[in-house]
């Protein structure tokens, strides 16, 4: 049945528990020497997410001394049976009654081969949100948890893990701020034909971007396994940039999975342009910083940089405006923001959140840029001395950033308006340019 929830052996791992990739004998290659290790290679999440190895060096104490001497070489490789060589850093060496121990970090991903033909690729996602989607079943348990993404000849199925409820995983993640596989999925061609594993890298990258932009922080896709005739013939394990769990308020309407289904192909199309791909990754970084635990002032500066980048690229580089490059450079930030926000029918008025100070400013872009300028060039005036006002300025800037990103991508669905307080999950509105078109 098509609506049966996906399973994965990786779901056995609990919050913050390292994911084992390999257990057994492997070697560390240092210059022309090979040192045999009995141990494990795994994805660890604490104190920082990374690919690591640890184990015991085979041989007596003299072998340990040889290893320590050889470590002066700058190039050390790990040889794991069934996988390609990967460069490593040694993080620790100890000798004791239980053997000579060594541990280290893999600098890059570890994979079985650079490229292989498969007909299906399964993957896991760490730290995505508790979203609702299409109805699926696991045994007697029925729940809303599937998202179906399509792009040209490709299909991606993404399922929230079927045991999320009885294990209370999202409550536990919220309390711990940790790391856990929250979703599993697969990718294949619509016609079920074979494909090269390297061929789908842009799709996986685009999915990572989309899920991170929806969560307001970096999620991860750490495990990728390629299948042919129901057998795993290719594997790749990696630890991209990932943030600990936080339950952020973002644009993403969690109870409407079609939002991701609508946006995914638009993200892939935009990222096919190398320049826009670079810009979108930069915007994601600044957007994630805006949801971090940093002070409000730092987050506002990050948002302003993102807004200025989008305005410059959209209006000038992509020539969506008749304004000349020389004239644009003489415009102040508020004028630039008004120009691009107006292109997407985004309200320029000062939100009702600013009851006490709204009379001092022309509009929203003016208010936001004045606050940002006072961060960089402080004065004795205390217009924004109230911490709540500072927080609302951040909300305003992030709202601009969310809508501009969605607008540039061509999204026309529902979103969460963070300026409409109190925010109630399930209460959404259409993006303003969609309302205009109707």
From Swiss-Prot:
Gene Ontology cellular component list: plasma membrane
Domain of life: Bacteria
Primary subcellular site in the record, as a coarse category: membrane
Location in the cell: Cell membrane
Keywords: Cell membrane, Membrane, Transmembrane, Transmembrane helix
Segments crossing the lipid bilayer: 391-411
Membrane-related topology note: Single-pass membrane protein
Protein name: SPbeta prophage-derived uncharacterized protein YopA
Organism: Bacillus subtilis (strain 168)
